[in-house]
Design a protein with these regions (language model features):
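Short amphipathic, positively biased membrane-proximal segments
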Residues: 1-136
Length: 136
């Protein structure tokens, strides 16, 4: 049960920011992977703020989140990697749509997009950190 919740949680973080889940899930790995994943996550935080960034619910964005969610979900579920991967995908897809709805509603209310994006960054990072820390 604990692996299932962790997988859903890291998947949700991935749905908000694609590279946050993998960066957190594999932070303890050896080699250059962790640095590459962290750099990709930081790059995503910057790119997300650009007006030209496509919607996360477009096919490519959802596919990237599903793949990252699967890898991250499996990474935090050592006892049940396949179930972890499936739950990571579910969490990522659900959070992608919820995050997009949040941003649409914020825009409708004329809230500052940059501040809303930073809040979403903070939510993704906080969730990912919580999941990884609960894994130890």
């Amino acid at each position: 049960m604990k692996d299932a919740l962790r997988s859903l949680g890291i998947g949700a973080a991935t749905g908000l920011r694609t590279m946050t889940g993998p960066a957190a899930a594999f932070a303890a790995s050896s080699g250059n992977w962790r640095w590459l994943l962290r750099a990709a996550a930081v790059g995503e935080y910057v790119v997300d703020k650009l007006p030209s960034t496509p919607s996360r619910t477009q096919p490519f964005g959802l596919a990237a989140r599903a793949i990252a969610g699967a890898l991250s979900g499996a990474g935090v579920a050592p006892e049940s990697r396949y179930a972890g991967a499936a739950l990571g995908v579910a969490g990522a897809i659900a959070a992608a749509y919820l995050g997009a709805a949040y941003r649409r509603e914020a825009a409708r209310r004329k809230l500052p997009d940059f501040a809303c994006a930073l809040l979403e960054d903070a939510a993704a990072i906080t969730l990912a950190r919580y999941v990884v820390r609960s894994n130890s």
